[in-house]
């Protein structure tokens, strides 16, 4: 379907198993390249969409010297935006519990910034999905944190895991964005190249 990409070798710069799963589902051939320590810090003045876009651009810049002449690099970053602040990946069990408590019974946004980069050009975009959580009790939060893998996920949850089944009341926007990559929007962007 994306014959226009035949001239490129697609490189996904991500350790995320969910992003790999989504790229595989898109049906394009790609390889994964990762660097050990890409800086994911950002200026405190950034808000909402600006944060994951900034980090996606920084990730692309970190890989710039590795991009071959026929390569198309995809970088992404996802945050949970809640009550005026970004929730990234938790730093430990207690941090994960506190994040989930703060999301319980409330709405938040999941925002992913994506950059598609070659040696000659770069195109970046953001996707925003509104998510509403049901009220979660302490046992549900502890069960999820102790039995699943919240530590590698923005906001301490994976919508495709148990917490998504029992805790997510509604989603407005891309479900796949909540997983970490707005694959439909990425497909549309790639189709226009």
Swiss-Prot record:
GO terms for biological process: nucleotide metabolic process. Nucleoside triphosphate pyrophosphatase that hydrolyzes dTTP and UTP. May have a dual role in cell division arrest and in preventing the incorporation of modified nucleotides into cellular nucleic acids. One of its GO terms (molecular function) is UTP diphosphatase activity. The active site is at 77 (proton acceptor). GO terms for cellular component: cytoplasm. Keywords: Cytoplasm, Hydrolase, Nucleotide metabolism. Belongs to the Maf family. YhdE subfamily. HAMAP family: Maf (MF_00528). It comes from the Bacteria. It is found in: Cytoplasm. Pfam families: Maf (PF02545). Its cofactor is a divalent metal cation. The record marks 18, 78, 160 as: Important for substrate specificity. Its EC number is 3.6.1.9. This is dTTP/UTP pyrophosphatase. Gene3D superfamilies: 3.90.950.10. It catalyses: dTTP + H2O = dTMP + diphosphate + H(+); UTP + H2O = UMP + diphosphate + H(+).
């Amino acid at each position: 379907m994306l014959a226009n990409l035949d001239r490129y070798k697609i490189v996904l710069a991500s350790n995320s198993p969910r992003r790999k799963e989504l790229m595989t589902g898109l049906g394009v051939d790609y390889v994964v390249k990762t660097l050990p320590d890409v800086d994911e810090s950002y200026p405190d003045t950034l808000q909402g969409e600006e944060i994951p876009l900034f980090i996606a651009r920084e990730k692309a810049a970190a890989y710039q010297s590795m991009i071959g002449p026929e390569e198309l690099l995809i970088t992404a970053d996802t945050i949970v935006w809640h009550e005026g602040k970004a929730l990234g990946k938790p730093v430990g069990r207690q941090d994960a519990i506190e994040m989930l408590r703060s999301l319980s019974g409330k709405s938040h946004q999941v925002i992913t910034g994506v950059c598609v980069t070659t040696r000659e050009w770069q195109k970046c975009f953001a996707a925003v999905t509104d998510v509403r959580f049901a009220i979660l009790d302490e046992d549900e939060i502890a069960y999820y944190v102790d039995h699943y893998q919240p530590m590698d996920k923005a906001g301490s949850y994976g919508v495709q895991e148990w917490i998504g089944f029992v805790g997510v009341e509604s989603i407005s926007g891309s479900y796949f964005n909540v997983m970490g990559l707005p694959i439909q929007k990425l497909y549309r962007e790639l189709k226009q190249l």
